[in-house]
Amino acid sequence: ISTGELNEGQKYDFDFDHQFIETGKYDAKPTYKKFTGYSPGVAVIGDHIVGIENRDGNTNVRFRQQDTLERIFTRLEDNGIHIDRVRMDCGSCSEEIVDVVKDHCNHFYIRANRCSAFYDDMFILRGWRTEEINGIEFELNSIIVEKWKGKPYRLVVQRQRRTDKTQELWE
């Protein structure tokens, strides 16, 4: 707000992900990406970093992520910034994280982990819709799931034709 890049009272799209930074610093830890470094959680609105918190390179990306997000969301809200949509990858697909996210936005999109419990249901889905995403053609569909008891969410499923003509499904 102080730089004039974001406007109080306006709604924004919010992206969150962990960035892996290779470094040889003495306190850096090995990452699951097989190099030594840091992996801070980074929150972005448009081209603007609105939150960043470091964590050890070898810490699971879900570790206390809900606390990091709560601090970032609260700081934005205290400054009159409202979040319309949140986008996150599968590293944020946990009940604790979803509970925090849903309280601070109108809509959220979190890529789910592959889940064998839903895999068979994917093959009986009808009405797949073809969409091009970043130049790649996907087929999309959705189902309502209760991954966490008593909390139904819409799961969007995408699949892509492989060159060997079999289909790949993932949630």
PLM region descriptions:
Residues 78, 98-107:
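Short, surface-exposed basic-aromatic patches at helix termini and helix-loop junctions that form
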Residues 19-21, 55-57, 91-93, 113-115:
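Active-site beta-loop-alpha junctions enriched in small/polar residues
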Residues 12-20, 47, 83-93, 108:
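Short, conserved catalytic/metal-binding motifs centered on acidic residues
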Residues 7-8, 80-82:
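Short helix-loop-beta connector
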Residues 31-79:
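Electropositive, glycine- and tryptophan-enriched low-complexity nucleic-acid-binding patches
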